[in-house]
Amino acid sequence: NAFFTGLGKGRKIALFDTLINQLEEEELEAVLAHEIGHYKLKHVPKMIIWSFCLTLAGLYLLDLIAKQAGFVEAFGFSSEGYGFGPPFILFILLSSNITFWLTPLSSYWSRKFEYQADKFAATVIGSNLPMVTALRKLNEKNLSNLTPHPLYSGFHYDHPSLIERESALQK
């Protein structure tokens, strides 16, 4: 596996030893170029902004819920004297049910960034072949599903499937 992380002076690219051991040099260069693409295309700050927007939307939703007559009483709380506490506790408890339905939006952005980083790597390397062969090896080693159902993929995959990535690289 490989990933890019960090902001400012704390930026890092991690390449796992298992990745280094299973790929050829040109494939490693493509993977490294892919991770550099995440940096150059500012994917980490964009995802932080996206997460911040989701948090704001969640807090706005909390405000709307907290103002609904009978909401806190429906869960056994008194509406008098507790202020914002019960709605906040309920929001924390119920938020995973809400954010689950937003997962496809986050997955969409993540997959979009993966396509962009793949394209960046192919452009920098001058060929899409090293990236394609690296992806094939990684998918084989990880026993990845080549054709996940789109609905399942939307909720559970933050990276496109091998077939989707290869197809995008061929364009």
Task: Enumerate the language-model features and the residues they cover.
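Hydrophobic alpha-helical transmembrane segments
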Residues: 79-93
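Hydrophobic alpha-helical transmembrane segments of polytopic membrane proteins
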Residues: 92-104
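Polar-ligand-bearing catalytic/cofactor-coordination segments
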Residues: 1-82, 101-171
